[in-house]
């Protein structure tokens, strides 16, 4: 390789750099590491040097081999991987031989030829830059405006003025079917609001994760339908063309409709790029010559039709080759075609799994929609009048379900459109209802305003075709329709054009032969209407040609039988809309506005379906109770809902969102026959007669939450507002059958508790068991709870665990517990921030209240002194306490004499829970004195994690042979050792030992000890031994 030849090649590489990259190259040239043995070039000489001058300077100062190495290093540093690879691939074989005079002459001629080529390329480069500017201008013009879905001819909206920022997160989320579940977006958003999830910055979308990583070449935007994927892709195009985004990274951005490409004619990638460019004969060859400077925006991967399981041989590698659209895009995605090009792909979650099979490394970004602040911003941007915007936003804020749904930009637009049309017509916003069905009905009727009798008939006939088309698409899981599909359902091209104008359909401007509903939920809405529209006198669908293929079965039983079976959950919203549409008031409204007849015949079938699901033995089947409630809520017809709810003897649902609370409140307040009501978030309700549940309850295993669950619970603060509480609690005073209420884990708070207390004192309230664990209660509500205990003789079980009641709250509570009319039998006060100061009040209750038999005080700092005070009253033979829980109460052996005294005098006490207290061997020795007394009737003793060793096993051995009442002994998580356990085994073999259950969890045994336990179990099958070697 001759020197001049190296100079020409370096100059050509430098010529490929854009102005900004060329400046970066010069900057890095100054910072080139001196340890690499290169001479730095003075800045004065490089500052004004062009490509040839700079190449010459590099070689003159450092020689051709070092100059080549410098260029490679800097290409990598400025992220020009293409030039780095090219320079690496074309690197000469360096020789030290002297160059002859003849060679120098040949080199001089070659240099002149190279310079002439350089001047020619400079001219071409200028033309290229001129075309780049022309293309950017074209993109700005094309993407600066958008058309609202109901825009009239010539109407458009400035994208920059309307666009509202969406929340993007980088973390990869679960692949649940949520494309058509608008409300599920609200749930997802609510769950992560308090979680430390960082938002994604669009400017850094293609940047490497860290300084040691490669740049990102493929980004996937995922989000449900209507969440804003397309509008975000268009905004990226506009910002790039306006020189606000990716200026240093991409020379060209091309926006590709996946739907259009997959359904269009065969073409090459060059043809596809040309279709995105202005004017004839764009420089395709020059554009694709630098694929690393190209970004393809593929919008709507989920709408891409075609197979994606081709072998790699079937893929396209030549940008000039004509192929099917799906082959072209698959080749780009799989990096067989222009592998150095970058991709930004938008898709719905349901297609993500298919996409992942095609991708290599990719950055996944999820679009979560609008935050609360952004929703307000959207309203302000949509309404030109700020006062109108604030009035509309206040209305939706008060309306929780719609406010939640407005996380989704499309729904936000629908709501704003409907409200603005009402405002413009002078109608009251109070008429706007609160369900999805009501919003869609109003939107539909606004678009189908009659224009004379003939227009009414025309709309009515077209409605038939729309509904049958929608239902056919639902059953066949089809969202794209060709003109032949429209004709098969009696829809003419003129009808479709009219509906496009009125925004019931969306027709792609560049792909006129294919149609789709503007949103999947609209298709589901029309599919639901298909089951309600009356047929004509001949029993046939109006306006449907005889050549039409077989229409979907209109039997609603078939629809309900298939509920939940579709992979994409298509039928969930169809059934919800079905319930919403049979509301008699809405039916009359629709019949008047749409000039059609809607049948009410299916009401009985829907009622039977609800009854069958309500009486199902398992709650795990589809649909869940909550989903049934959503259906009834959508209907908003109290008589029907009350009949349906009469089939729910037991309600047990988990609430996750505000919307869940609203829906459950509506249904529960219309329920008259429920016997047990559990609105739970994180806990399971305790069982009346199940020993293990009570033990678990006393141990507070249920209080162990993961960090996420805690954050999630905190994110639900104020969900149970006073108005919601009154709605839910109204059923308590009107339903004599309702005896159990579990609200554990809900943020009830003192205001909600006060509302509940009012209800509990109503004569018609028959609640016997009430669980209020972790409900954000404080001492301020204890006076009202005390009043309930004094006046409600029916309440026998109360759980107030995990509420910061404090000593003062317990003092107030004890006033009611001491009352003559208090019949409470079981009381949980676990983890209520109590100290020994509360024990005086509790002791006074034990000496006067003869109904209380179970008291759980675990997870409170009672200490030895506090327990000593309690024991003075418990040891009274007239105290009826049977079960006492003192788990993790800060006890030592100091309290054991008092406990031993209780055991030797009170024959009513049968269960004592002392886990997590440092009693030690001495404590057990003192306890055994009471346990060996003839008056002791204790059946269950739990001493897990009590700092015991093998020394206590002698005392326990004596206990096991002498005490005839003890049936269960728990010694887990103690250091008893093999010797201690073997001693117990010898005693347990004796016939005089009546123990039925021994728990030795979280303890290590050697082989001999383990074998001894197994042998004992075999020889004495009536004895259950539970042991798990520690790991």
Swiss-Prot record:
Modified residues (Phosphoserine): 5, 156, 195, 198, 262, 292, 331, 723, 730, 801, 1030
Phosphotyrosine carried by residues: 13, 131, 135, 138, 856
Sites where the protein binds ATP: 164, 223-230, 519
Modification(s) after translation: Phosphorylation at Ser-198 by MAPK8/JNK1 increases inflammasome activation by promoting deubiquitination by BRCC3 and NLRP3 homooligomerization. Phosphorylation at Ser-801 by CSNK1A1 prevents inflammasome activation by preventing NEK7 recruitment. Phosphorylation at Ser-5 in the pyrin domain inhibits homomultimerization of NLRP3 and activation of the NLRP3 inflammasome: dephosphorylation by protein phosphatase 2A (PP2A) promotes assembly of the NLRP3 inflammasome. Phosphorylation at Ser-292 by PKD/PRKD1 promotes NLRP3 inflammasome assembly. Ubiquitinated; undergoes both 'Lys-48'- and 'Lys-63'-linked polyubiquitination. Ubiquitination does not lead to degradation, but inhibits inflammasome activation. Deubiquitination is catalyzed by BRCC3 and associated with NLRP3 activation and inflammasome assembly. This process can be induced by the activation of Toll-like receptors (by LPS), through a non-transcriptional pathway dependent on the mitochondrial production of reactive oxygen species, and by ATP. Ubiquitinated by TRIM31 via 'Lys-48'-linked ubiquitination, leading to its degradation by the proteasome.
Keyword Disulfide bond: no
Span(s) of short sequence motif KFERQ-like motif 4: 986-990
Record comment: activity regulation: Under resting conditions, NLRP3 binds ADP and is autoinhibited. Inactive NLRP3 forms homodecameric double-ring cages that hide pyrin domains within NACHT-LRR rings to avoid premature activation. NLRP3 activation stimuli include extracellular ATP, nigericin, reactive oxygen species, crystals of monosodium urate or cholesterol, amyloid-beta fibers, environmental or industrial particles and nanoparticles, such as asbestos, silica, aluminum salts, cytosolic dsRNA, etc. Almost all stimuli trigger intracellular K(+) efflux.
Main location per the UniProt record: cytoplasm
Domain FISNA: 135-207
Chain positions of cross-link Glycyl lysine isopeptide (Lys-Gly) (interchain with G-Cter in ubiquitin): 321, 427, 687, 873, 968
Subcellular location(s) per record: Cytoplasm, Cytosol; Inflammasome; Cytoplasm, Cytoskeleton, Microtubule organizing center; Golgi apparatus membrane
Motif (KFERQ-like motif 1): 352-356
Molecular-function GO term, any one: molecular sensor activity
Keyword line: Activator, Amyloidosis, ATP-binding, Cytoplasm, Cytoskeleton, Endoplasmic reticulum, Golgi apparatus, Hydrolase, Immunity, Inflammasome, Inflammatory response, Innate immunity, Isopeptide bond, Leucine-rich repeat, Lipoprotein, Membrane, Mitochondrion, Nucleotide-binding, Nucleus, Palmitate, Phosphoprotein, Repeat, Secreted, Transcription, Transcription regulation, Ubl conjugation
Its EC number(s): 3.6.4.-
Region of interest (Required for binding to phosphatidylinositol 4-phosphate (PtdIns4P)), residue spans: 126-129
Any one GO biological process: positive regulation of transcription by RNA polymerase II
Repeat region (LRR), residues: 737-757, 766-787, 794-814, 823-844, 851-871, 880-901, 908-929, 937-958, 965-986
Sequence similarity: Belongs to the NLRP family.
Domain-related comment: The pyrin domain (also called DAPIN domain or PYD) is involved in PYCARD/ASC-binding. The FISNA domain is a critical mediator of NLRP3 conformational during NLRP3 activation. It becomes ordered in its key regions during activation to stabilize the active NACHT conformation and mediate most interactions in the NLRP3 disk.
Identification of the protein by name: NACHT, LRR and PYD domains-containing protein 3
Top-level taxonomy: Eukaryota, Metazoa, Chordata, Craniata, Vertebrata
């Amino acid at each position: 390789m001759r020197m001049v030849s190296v100079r020409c090649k370096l100059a050509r590489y430098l010529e490929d750099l854009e102005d900004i990259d060329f400046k970066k190259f010069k900057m890095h040239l100054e910072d080139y590491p001196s340890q690499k043995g290169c001479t730095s070039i003075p800045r004065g000489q490089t500052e004004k040097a062009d490509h040839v001058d700079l190449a010459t300077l590099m070689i003159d100062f450092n020689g051709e081999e070092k100059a080549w190495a410098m260029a490679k290093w800097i290409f990598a540093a400025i992220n020009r991987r293409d030039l780095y690879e090219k320079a690496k691939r074309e690197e000469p074989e360096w020789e030290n031989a002297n160059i002859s005079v003849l060679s120098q002459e040949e080199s001089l001629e070659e240099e002149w030829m190279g310079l002439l080529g350089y001047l020619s390329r400079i001219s071409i480069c200028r033309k290229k830059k001129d075309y780049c500017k022309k293309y950017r201008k074209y993109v700005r013009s094309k993407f600066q405006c958008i058309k609202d879905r109901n825009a009239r001819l010539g109407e458009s909206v400035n994208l920059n003025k309307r666009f509202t920022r969406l929340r993007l997160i980088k973390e990869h989320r679960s692949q649940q079917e949520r494309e058509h579940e608008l409300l599920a977006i609200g749930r997802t958003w609510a769950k992560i609001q308090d979680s430390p999830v960082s938002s994604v910055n669009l400017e850094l979308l293609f940047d490497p994760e860290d300084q040691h990583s490669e740049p990102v070449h493929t980004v996937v935007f995922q989000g449900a339908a209507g969440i804003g994927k397309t509008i975000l892709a268009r905004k990226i195009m506009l910002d790039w063309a306006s020189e606000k985004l990716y200026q240093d990274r991409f020379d060209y951005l091309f926006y590709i409709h996946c739907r259009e490409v997959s359904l269009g004619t065969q073409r090459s990638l060059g043809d596809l790029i040309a279709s995105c460019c202005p004017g004839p004969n764009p420089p395709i060859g020059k554009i694709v010559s630098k694929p690393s400077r190209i970004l393809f925006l593929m919008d709507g991967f989920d709408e891409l039709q075609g197979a994606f399981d081709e072998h790699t041989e079937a893929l396209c590698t030549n940008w000039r080759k004509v192929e099917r659209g799906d082959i072209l895009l698959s080749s780009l995605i799989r990096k067989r075609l222009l592998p150095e090009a970058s991709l930004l792909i938008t898709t719905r979650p349901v297609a993500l799994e298919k996409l992942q099979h095609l991708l290599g490394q990719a950055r996944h970004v999820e679009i979560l929609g609008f935050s609360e602040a952004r929703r307000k911003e959207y309203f302000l941007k949509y309404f030109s009048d700020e006062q109108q915007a604030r009035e509309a936003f206040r209305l939706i804020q008060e309306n929780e379900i719609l406010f939640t749904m407005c996380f989704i930009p499309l729904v936000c637009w629908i709501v704003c459109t409907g409200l603005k049309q009402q405002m413009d017509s002078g109608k009251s916003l109070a008429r706007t209802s609160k369900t999805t069905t009501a919003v869609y009905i109003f939107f539909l009727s606004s678009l189908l305003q009659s224009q004379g009798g003939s227009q009414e008939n025309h709309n009515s006939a077209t409605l038939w075709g729309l509904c049958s088309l929608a239902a056919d698409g639902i059953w066949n899981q089809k969202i794209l329709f060709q003109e032949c599909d429209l004709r098969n359902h009696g829809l003419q091209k003129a009808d479709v054009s009219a509906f496009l104008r009125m925004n019931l359909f969306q027709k792609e401007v560049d792909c006129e032969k294919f149609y789709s509903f503007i949103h999947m939920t609209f298709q589901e809405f029309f599919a639901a209407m298909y089951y309600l529209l009356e047929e004509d006198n001949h029993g046939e669908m109006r306006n449907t040609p005889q050549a039409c293929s077989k229409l979907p079965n209109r039997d609603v039983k078939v629809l309900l039988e298939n509920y939940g079976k579709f992979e994409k959950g298509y039928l969930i919203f169809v059934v919800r809309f079905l319930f919403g549409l049979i509301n008699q008031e809405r039916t009359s409204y629709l019949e008047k506005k749409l000039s059609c007849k809607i049948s009410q015949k299916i009401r009985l079938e829907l009622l039977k379906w609800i009854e069958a699901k309500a009486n199902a033995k398992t709650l795990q089947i589809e649909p869940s109770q909550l989903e049934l409630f959503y259906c009834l809520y959508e209907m908003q017809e109290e008589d029907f809902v009350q009949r349906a709810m009469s089939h729910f003897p037991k309600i047990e649902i988990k609430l996750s969102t505000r919307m869940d609370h609203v829906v459950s409140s509506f249904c529960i307040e219309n329920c008259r026959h429920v016997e047990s009501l559990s609105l739970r978030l994180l806990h399971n309700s305790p069982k009346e007669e199940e020993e293990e549940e009570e033990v678990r309850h006393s141990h507070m295993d249920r209080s162990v939450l993961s960090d996420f669950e805690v954050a999630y619970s905190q994110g639900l603060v104020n969900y149970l507002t006073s108005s919601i509480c009154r709605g839910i609690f109204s059923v308590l005073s009107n339903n004599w059958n309702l005896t159990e209420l579990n609200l554990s884990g809900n943020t009830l708070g003192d205001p909600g508790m006060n509302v509940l207390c009012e209800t509990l004192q109503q004569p018609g309230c028959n609640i016997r068991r009430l669980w209020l664990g972790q409900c954000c209660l404080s001492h301020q509500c204890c006076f009202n709870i005390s009043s309930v205990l004094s006046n409600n003789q029916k309440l026998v079980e109360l759980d107030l665990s995990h509420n910061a009641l404090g000593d003062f709250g317990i003092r107030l509570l004890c006033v009611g517990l001491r009352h003559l009319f208090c019949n409470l039998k079981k009381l949980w006060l676990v983890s209520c921030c109590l100290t020994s100061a509360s024990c005086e009040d509790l002791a006074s209750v034990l000496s006067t209240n003869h109904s209380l038999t179970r008291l759980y005080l675990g997870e409170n700092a009672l200490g030895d002194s506090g327990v000593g005070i309690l024991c003075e009253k418990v040891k009274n033979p007239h105290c009826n306490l049977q079960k006492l829980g003192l788990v993790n109460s800060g006890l030592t052996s100091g309290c054991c004499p008092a406990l031993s005294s209780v055991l030797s005098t009170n024959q009513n006490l049968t269960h004592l829970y002392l886990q997590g207290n440092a009693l030690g061997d001495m404590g057990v020795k003192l306890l055994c004195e009471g346990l060996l007394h003839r008056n002791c009737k204790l059946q269950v003793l739990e001493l897990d994690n009590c700092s015991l060793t093998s020394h206590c096993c002698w005392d326990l051995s004596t206990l096991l042979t002498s005490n005839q009442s003890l049936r269960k002994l728990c010694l887990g998580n103690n250091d008893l050792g093999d010797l201690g356990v073997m001693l117990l085994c010898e005693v347990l073999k004796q016939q005089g030992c009546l123990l039925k259950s021994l728990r030795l969890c979280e303890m290590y045994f050697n082989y001999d000890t383990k074998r001894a336990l197994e042998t004992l179990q075999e020889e004495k099958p009536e004895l259950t031994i539970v042991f798990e070697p520690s790991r």
